[in-house]
Amino acid sequence: MVRTKADSVPGTYRKVVAARAPRKVLGSSTSATNSTSVSSRKAENKYAGGNPVCVRPTPKWQKGIGEFFRLSPKDSEKENQIPEEAGSSGLGKAKRKACPLQPDHTNDEKE
């Protein structure tokens, strides 16, 4: 039971009950036939995707979804990488020395 502000009023008593969604019935041929015909009608009326409240045009710079499927293997390199560095494991490059950080002693002096 959930108590609400209305419970403080004398002489009234309300009980809040959570509702459940109806469950699908499987195995019955008649209900399966009815549910498919009803669901096909619902699918025609429903809006499929996007933002139905504020429809905005697609920007010119945005690629279509088909562009990603039509790319050849040589064009599928990362856009933001330099071609010489793309896919390299770093074996042929000069090794960088690791420079450990010097400990900061400013906090120790204050204590």
Curated annotation (Swiss-Prot):
A motif (KEN box) lies at residues 78-80. Expressed predominantly in liver, pancreas and placenta. Not detected in heart or brain. Highly expressed in a number of tumors, especially esophageal tumors, in anaplastic thyroid carcinomas, adrenocortical carcinomas, and in non-small-cell lung cancer lines. InterPro entries: PCNA-AF (IPR040444), PCNA-AF_dom (IPR031444). GO terms for cellular component: centrosome; nucleoplasm; nucleus; perinuclear region of cytoplasm. It is found in: Nucleus; Cytoplasm, Perinuclear region. Keywords: Acetylation, Cytoplasm, DNA damage, DNA repair, Isopeptide bond, Nucleus, Phosphoprotein, Ubl conjugation. The modification N6-acetyllysine is found at residue 24. Changing residue 68 to A: Loss of binding to PCNA. There is a cross-link at residues 15, 24 (Glycyl lysine isopeptide (Lys-Gly) (interchain with G-Cter in ubiquitin)). The modification Phosphoserine is found at residues 8, 28, 31, 72. The PIP-box mediates the interaction with PCNA. The KEN box is required for the association with the APC/C complex. PANTHER family: PCNA-ASSOCIATED FACTOR (PTHR15679:SF8). This is PCNA-associated factor. It comes from Homo sapiens.
